[in-house]
């Protein structure tokens, strides 16, 4: 998904950085693996706060951000043994730097919905949509039965300062008439080498969406998990600021201890991270769906017409 969503750009950017390491050899959710995920997330979200906005109003440097050479340079900055400090992370694209005051950010709204669907003819849809806050603006359209959103909060009303959920943005995401606000939505469809769809996924979760989708892709493609295993696996999240790792129950005590020794600050997530809805096409052509149990009301349905 292109700007003004930041999802597609930074999903590709992070995968480009990570492809330079043998992640599978490190072991899923090992300290070495999580360290590299976190350092990659840290740099991508620093770029997000500075460079992303509505491309109709601001020249978003998409080509530079997803360039493999740029990813390789970011990878070289990562010490495999020691955590970086977010305060020390500088913008990577010097030629398009924009001034922005750095402030603490907290995970944004989780009032977002995602669904994935796949029919017998091979048509695939991965759809994410949101009202922003719970019940959006709290105003419904008379006799129409739907709520109006409050997406204005996704703008940087004052660049360099946090919005209602603590996310910091820059000049690129400032308010202007007719402009679209920045989001983290990352509806994703993956194609195999034969250019056939093999995976549809996405999730709600505000600023955690991009990292959730990335971990779903790594779980399925890198670690050969089935779609149910990939969905159930514990997740982590880092978003540059605040400088700590959010993690779900299930992360091993050994991994947490090693990460702390490396200098990371761990913050037990007060809630589960996202609620992915995914469909995976097996090599034999069968479709396997997985609805995330992190949120109530999820479901996976398969229907066959006579």
Sequence positions of predicted segments:
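Glycine-rich phosphate/pyrophosphate-binding beta-alpha loops
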Residues: 1-8, 116, 128-139, 202-210
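Extended C-terminal subregions enriched in glycine
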Residues: 121, 179-180, 213-214, 222-271
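Internal maturation/activation junctions in enzymes
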Residues: 20-131, 143-144, 151, 158-161, ...
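Active-site rim segments in enzyme catalytic domains, especially the processed small/beta chain
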Residues: 123-193, 223, 227
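Short, small/polar residue-rich loop motifs at catalytic or cofactor-binding pockets
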Residues: 109-112, 134, 183-185, 275
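Short Gly/Pro-enriched turn/cap motifs at secondary-structure boundaries
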Residues: 5, 104-108, 173-182, 267-271
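Alpha-helical support elements that line or immediately flank enzyme active sites
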Residues: 16-19, 203-225
């Amino acid at each position: 998904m292109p700007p003004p969503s930041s999802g597609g750009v930074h999903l590709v950017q992070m995968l480009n950085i990570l492809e330079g390491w043998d992640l599978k050899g490190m072991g899923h959710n090992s300290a070495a693996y999580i360290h590299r995920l976190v350092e990659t997330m840290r740099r991508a979200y620093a770029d997000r706060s500075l460079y992303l906005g509505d491309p109709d109003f601001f020249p978003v440097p998409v080509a530079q951000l997803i360039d493999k050479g740029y990813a390789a340079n970011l990878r070289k900055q990562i010490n495999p043994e020691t955590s970086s400090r977010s305060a020390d992370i500088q913008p990577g694209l010097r030629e398009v730097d924009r001034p922005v005051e750095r402030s603490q950010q907290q995970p944004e709204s989780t009032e977002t919905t995602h669904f994935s669907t796949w029919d017998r003819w091979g048509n695939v849809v991965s759809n994410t949509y949101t009202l922003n806050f719970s019940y959006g603006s709290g105003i419904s359209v008379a006799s129409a039965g739907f709520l109006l959103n409050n997406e204005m909060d996704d703008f940087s009303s004052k660049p360099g300062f946090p919005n209602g959920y603590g996310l910091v943005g820059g000049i690129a995401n400032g308010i202007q008439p007719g402009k679209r606000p920045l989001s983290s939505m990352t509806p994703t469809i993956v194609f195999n080498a034969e250019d056939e769809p093999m995976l549809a996924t996405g999730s709600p979760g505000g600023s955690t969406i991009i990292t959730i989708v990335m971990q779903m892709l790594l779980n399925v493609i890198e670690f050969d998990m089935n779609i149910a295993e990939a969905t159930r696996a514990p997740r982590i999240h880092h978003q540059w600021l605040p400088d700590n790792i959010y993690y779900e129950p299930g992360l091993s005590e050994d991994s947490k201890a090693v990460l702390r020794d490396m200098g990371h600050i761990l913050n037990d997530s007060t809630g589960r991270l996202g609620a992915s809805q995914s469909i995976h096409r097996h090599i034999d052509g069968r479709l396997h769906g997985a609805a995330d149990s992190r949120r109530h009301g999820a479901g996976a349905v398969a229907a066959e017409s006579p």
